[in-house]
Amino acid sequence: MSARKILILNGHPGQTSLSKSLCAAYQAAAEENGHQMRCHDISQMQFDMDYGQGGYENPKPLEPDLAQFLEDLEWAEHVVMAAPLWWGAVPAKLKAVFDRALLPGRAFDTRNVSFMGLPAPMLTGKTARVLLTSDTPALWLRLFYGNAVKKFISRQILGFVGIKPTRFSTFAPATDAPEAKVKTWLAAAGGLGAKAA
């Protein structure tokens, strides 16, 4: 496999987390296999989370961390995002990254609208992998919640701007997981990184 350009986004706002460890395992294996990496960690990113009232007509200027994230997103061929499932969705700060950074003219084109009324995506030709940690078992997420968070991420965020397909790896239940189980999860993340999958 030829080297790929990979963007990793750790979407857990804590300084230490399973999400961060999964990102590190993925990154280490990807680098060992010659893939190019750019990494962002929302616990280190500084920006105003409030989208504000300006809308797309008068958006807030992107802070340096968001501007760099968007530049790296445009550069990447493959996007890896790790995040915990909190109250059925991703953490607010991670959602704010997309609220603020995915702007018209860079992520989607409102001047070019489909017959369904949707703007043309501008980040096409990219794929994604989401490393989702949760205390809700994967079967429960699918049968009782209809994989709502997966649809939200893959269709309403990444797919909307052209990043597809998005594949998911779910690690659950995460809280108080035995050390041996965590090791298997980290190995799985490393296996994905080695293949840039």
Task: Indicate where each model-derived feature is located.
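N-terminal beta1-alpha1 ligand-phosphate binding loop
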Residues: 2-35
